[in-house]
Swiss-Prot record:
<dbReference type="GO" id="GO:0006813">
    <property type="term" value="P:potassium ion transport"/>
</dbReference>
<dbReference type="GO" id="GO:0003193">
    <property type="term" value="P:pulmonary valve formation"/>
</dbReference>
<dbReference type="GO" id="GO:0035050">
    <property type="term" value="P:embryonic heart tube development"/>
</dbReference>
<feature type="compositionally biased region" description="Basic residues">
    <location>
        <begin position="332"/>
        <end position="345"/>
    </location>
</feature>
<dbReference type="InterPro" id="IPR017990">
    <property type="entry name" value="Connexin_CS"/>
</dbReference>
<keyword id="KW-1133">Transmembrane helix</keyword>
<dbReference type="GO" id="GO:0098904">
    <property type="term" value="P:regulation of AV node cell action potential"/>
</dbReference>
<feature type="modified residue" description="Phosphoserine">
    <location>
        <position position="357"/>
    </location>
</feature>
<dbReference type="GO" id="GO:0086078">
    <property type="term" value="F:gap junction channel activity involved in bundle of His cell-Purkinje myocyte electrical coupling"/>
</dbReference>
<dbReference type="GO" id="GO:0060412">
    <property type="term" value="P:ventricular septum morphogenesis"/>
</dbReference>
<feature type="modified residue" description="Phosphoserine">
    <location>
        <position position="353"/>
    </location>
</feature>
<feature type="topological domain" description="Cytoplasmic">
    <location>
        <begin position="98"/>
        <end position="164"/>
    </location>
</feature>
<dbReference type="GO" id="GO:0010649">
    <property type="term" value="P:regulation of cell communication by electrical coupling"/>
</dbReference>
<dbReference type="GO" id="GO:1900825">
    <property type="term" value="P:regulation of membrane depolarization during cardiac muscle cell action potential"/>
</dbReference>
<dbReference type="GO" id="GO:0001501">
    <property type="term" value="P:skeletal system development"/>
</dbReference>
<dbReference type="GO" id="GO:0014704">
    <property type="term" value="C:intercalated disc"/>
</dbReference>
<dbReference type="GO" id="GO:0055117">
    <property type="term" value="P:regulation of cardiac muscle contraction"/>
</dbReference>
Length: 358
């Protein structure tokens, strides 16, 4: 039989871009089909036509009877089965390699464009790092199947499953399950029914049952892979939105406690929210100067009424001053002010009644 290395190299590339179940299917294909078929089964069906004997000397009768008993050899039938079953995987492998290559080119173009934007002194990827840009693996080391790549993979599984079923049914209708030792031929040019004998029927039956069992196992693996991919997509479509909604409910807008702004002890004016969300001072400089002037005049009048003989206002810390009408208690002088013994006027060194010492 021919060399399987060419097909094996292609299937090794498919192994890199397959799911876990797909890798098991490829292992079964390599070991239990190609290896067994190329080593043991071929020796059992060596020169099958030469070992086929018939009880006749009629020219051409033996060839006609062999064609009736074996329309196609089991070995060649199984080779066709492996080729047709592997073809969808090869098509998927070609699409995967094309997709990865396009992704690599796109990332390289983005890297070159970013280098042009940054300038000539930027870092350039070496060849080894450029090859790593085509990595499509997830965190657990598996290939991320999504988009058109996932659709192609599912189609390849469906086609190979159909091929598998077709070849199993075809083998049953052509040969049945077991080979019989005696085959009765009634075809022309045989003058009468001729008895023909198959060589090594028991050994061939063992290989036939084994290959049918491997084909059934491959079919079950294909169905399991379809179920795995379908269940994964259904879980991603229905479970993840529910988890997202639950997270949104848990992390909803929290109602905070609005706390008022408390000014420092010597700070008599609080900032208020102005239009546009900005802070502004509700009192202008002119208003503050006018209020301070009014407070000073009021304190001067009170000092003259309490101590008519003195020209200074004495502020005692232990005594709480009365607040005149119309003056806000929040704008009175703080308790940190004290009397000053310095001269109050540059024009005269004598203290006058209108001088104010704070």
């Amino acid at each position: 039989m021919g060399d399987w290395s060419f097909l094996g190299n292609f299937l090794e590339e498919v192994h890199k871009h397959s799911t876990v179940v797909g890798k098991v299917w490829l292992t079964v294909l390599f070991i239990f089909r190609m290896l067994v078929l190329g080593t043991a089964a071929e020796s059992s069906w060596g020169d099958e036509q030469a070992d086929f004997r018939c009880d006749t000397i009629q020219p051409g009768c033996q060839n006609v009877c062999y064609d009736q008993a074996f329309p196609i050899s089991h070995i060649r039938y199984w080779v066709l089965q492996i080729i047709f079953v592997s073809t969808p995987s090869l098509v998927y492998m070609g699409h995967a390699m094309h997709t990865v290559r396009m992704q690599e080119k796109r990332k390289l173009r983005e890297a070159e464009r970013a280098k042009e934007v940054r300038g000539s002194g930027s870092y350039e990827y070496p060849v080894a790092e450029k090859a790593e840009l085509s990595c499509w693996e997830e965190g657990n080391g598996r290939i991320a199947l999504q988009g058109t790549l996932l659709n192609t993979y599912v189609c390849s599984i469906l086609i190979r499953t159909t091929m598998e079923v077709g070849f199993i049914v075809g083998q049953y209708f052509i040969y049945g399950i077991f080979l019989t030792t005696l085959h009765v031929c009634r075809r022309s040019p045989c003058p009468h029914p001729v008895n023909c004998y198959v060589s090594r029927p028991t050994e061939k039956n063992v290989f036939i049952v084994f290959m049918l069992a491997v084909a059934a196992l491959s079919l079950l693996l294909s169905l399991a892979e379809l179920y795995h991919l379908g269940w994964k997509k259904i879980r991603q479509r229905f479970v993840k939105p529910r988890q997202h909604m639950a997270k949104c409910q848990l992390s909803g807008p929290s109602v905070g406690i609005v706390q008022s702004c408390t000014p420092p002890p010597d700070f008599n004016q609080c900032l208020e929210n102005g239009p546009g969300g900005k802070f502004f001072n509700p009192f202008s400089n002119n208003m503050a100067s006018q209020q301070n002037t009014d407070n000073l005049v009021t304190e001067q009048v009170r000092g003259q009424e309490q101590t008519p003989g003195e020209g200074f206002i004495q502020v005692r810390y232990g005594q709480k001053p009365e607040v005149p009408n119309g003056v806000s208690p929040g704008h009175r002088l703080p308790h940190g002010y004290h009397s000053d013994k310095r001269r109050l006027s540059k024009a005269s060194s004598k203290a006058r009644s209108d001088d104010l010492s704070v």
